[in-house]
């Protein structure tokens, strides 16, 4: 059995984000000046946390964000950054490079909601969820192999993480801590899978519209996993959400504009 924290961060802003254009997987854009500032602010916010593992989408905007976060970290600058294509953004097919309004118009013409619509050549929601499930499987395996001897106690059903609005909320007594840097649509689909399919426990008072809202650039979420092996299968026996889409660190970016 192993208990570990997973902190999820969306990449910083790109010019395509600013211009409300879809990037998906086919358009590999760098961070904008604001995106660099956002990533640095996230790095300063998380600077005192020790990330034992780091997993990053292999798209440029995510890699740059992770590099900046780790560059600001006091304990994790030497942690290996694993680039994983499973963490890429949802593929939007023919809609990539087009305005988001174009995707909405395509969905309306097809008689579907924008969230459920798959443009030609794009990934379905189920395909993206399958990628996240594959990532979780490899994550559980790696964490148990590397940290299976770490001392950790499983939180009880009655345990609720202390949420004080601090960067280490929920992770104070969890020595194994992974950082994942990915993308907006991918994170949104992943969180929905954790909550709806895997029965992730949520903090008291958190409303569902907050849980499933779009993640802002460098928005931060945290989950505590307890995993163990049943025969030859690794599974999570408990998942506790600590916070979702936190953006406190972005205040300093706004104030500097």
From Swiss-Prot:
Species per Swiss-Prot/TrEMBL record: Danio rerio
One GO MF term attached to the UniProt entry: catalytic activity
Main location: cytoplasm
Top-level EC class as recorded in UniProt: hydrolase
Catalytic activity: beta-D-fructose 2,6-bisphosphate + H2O = beta-D-fructose 6-phosphate + phosphate
SUPFAM superfamilies, alphabetized: Phosphoglycerate mutase-like (SSF53254)
Residues the record marks as site: Transition state stabilizer: 183
Subcellular localization, as worded in the UniProt entry: Cytoplasm; Nucleus; Mitochondrion
Active site per the UniProt annotation: 11, 89
The family this protein is said to belong to: Belongs to the phosphoglycerate mutase family.
E.C. code: 3.1.3.46
Disulfide bonds: none
One GO term describing the cellular component: cytoplasm
Gene: tigarb
PANTHER family reported in the protein's UniProt record: FRUCTOSE-2,6-BISPHOSPHATASE TIGAR, FRUCTOSE-2,6-BISPHOSPHATASE TIGAR B
Keyword annotations: Apoptosis, Autophagy, Cytoplasm, Hydrolase, Mitochondrion, Nucleus
The protein, known as: Fructose-2,6-bisphosphatase TIGAR B
Coiled-coil region list: none
Annotated function: Fructose-bisphosphatase hydrolyzing fructose-2,6-bisphosphate as well as fructose-1,6-bisphosphate. Acts as a negative regulator of glycolysis by lowering intracellular levels of fructose-2,6-bisphosphate in a p53/TP53-dependent manner, resulting in the pentose phosphate pathway (PPP) activation and NADPH production. Contributes to the generation of reduced glutathione to cause a decrease in intracellular reactive oxygen species (ROS) content, correlating with its ability to protect cells from oxidative or metabolic stress-induced cell death. May play a role in mitophagy inhibition.
BP term (GO), one: regulation of pentose-phosphate shunt
């Amino acid at each position: 059995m192993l208990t570990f924290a997973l902190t999820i961060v969306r990449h910083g802003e790109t010019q395509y984000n600013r211009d409300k254009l879809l990037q998906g997987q086919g358009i590999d854009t760098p961070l904008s000046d604001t995106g660099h500032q956002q990533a640095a602010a996230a790095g300063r916010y998380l600077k005192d946390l020790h990330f034992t593992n780091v997993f990053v989408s292999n798209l440029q905007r995510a890699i740059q964000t992770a590099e900046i976060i780790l560059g600001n970290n006091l304990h994790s600058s030497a942690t290996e950054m694993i680039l994983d294509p499973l963490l890429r953004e949802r593929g939007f097919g023919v809609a990539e490079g087009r305005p988001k309004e174009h995707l909405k118009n395509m969905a309306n013409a097809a008689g579907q909601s924008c969230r459920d619509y798959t443009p030609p050549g794009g990934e379905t929601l189920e395909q993206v969820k399958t990628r996240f499930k594959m990532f979780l499987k490899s994550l559980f395996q790696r964490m148990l192999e590397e940290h299976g001897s770490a001392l950790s106690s499983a939180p009880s059903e009655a345990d609720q993480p202390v949420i004080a609005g601090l960067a280490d909320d929920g992770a104070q007594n969890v020595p194994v801590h992974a950082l994942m840097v990915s993308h907006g649509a991918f994170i949104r689909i992943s969180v929905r899978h954790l909550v709806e399919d895997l029965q992730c426990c949520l903090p008291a008072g958190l409303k569902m519209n907050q849980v499933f809202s779009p993640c802002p650039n460098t928005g931060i979420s945290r989950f505590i996993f307890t995993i163990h092996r049943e025969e030859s299968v690794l599974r999570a026996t408990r998942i506790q959400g600590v916070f979702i889409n936190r953006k406190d660190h972005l205040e300093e970016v706004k104030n500097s504009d």
